[in-house]
Structures are given as C-alpha cells and as structure tokens.
Amino acid sequence: MRGMETLTDAAILLARVGLGVVFVAHGWQKFFTLGVTRVGEQFGTYGVPQPFVTASIVAGVELVAGIALVAGILTPLAGILLGVDMAGALYFVHATNGPFVSQNGWELVVALGVGALLIAAVGAGRFSVDRALGG
C-alpha cells in the first residue's frame, strides 16, 4: 500500500506545516508586533504566574517549536511543548469564555493544542528533517 503511505505522509506534512505556520505567526506577533512587555501585561490581567517571564517563554515556544513543526525536526518535543502552551492558554484565558473565538473562547486553542499533540504522537512523517536524520 505504497500509495496510502504516501497519502498519509503528505497529510502529516500538510498538518505540520499548517499548524507550524499558525504557531510561528503567534510567536512572531508576541515578540515583534505586540512585544513581550505588552503580552506580559495582558498575561498579568489573566493571573498568569510570572507574566513577563511567561510571555517570553510562550513567545519563544510558539516561534521556535512552530518552526520545528514546519521543518519536521524534533517533532515530538515541539508538539508536546505546543500542546502544553495551548493547555496554559486554555486554563488561564479561554476556558470560561465558551467555545467561540469571537468571544475569546477555547475552540482555537483546543484545535491547535490537540493538533500539536497528535503530530507529536504520530511523528513527522517521511517528508521531514526527522526522517532524513534517521528518526
């Protein structure tokens, strides 16, 4: 079933790149558009511990792990870190707002977090740096 394996690997590639680009955009926004100081201030209003430190860590995880997902390198680690990142966003910001993004709800963070964890579980697929390095 070579054709099915190729289809599976192509689907994993599309999922990795799609999720990775979204995370890169959010990390980039936190670092360079809003700035981590402003993000830290926002985090403080949500009761996030050490909000300025956490803002820097979250921005870094989203940017670096997002790039890792796109490339398919260290994919299980990147997926787990992003899943934890989204769990934090769910807990501190979105859980009580209902499901819809238009109301700052949880649907996007759940979809992103579950997607990242799924990629961590299934691996990067054949079209990845992980596979090229023998992983």
Predicted regions located by residue number:
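Membrane-interface interhelical connector segments
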Residues: 32-50, 54
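Extended, low-polarity transmembrane helix blocks
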Residues: 1-33, 52-60, 64, 71-135
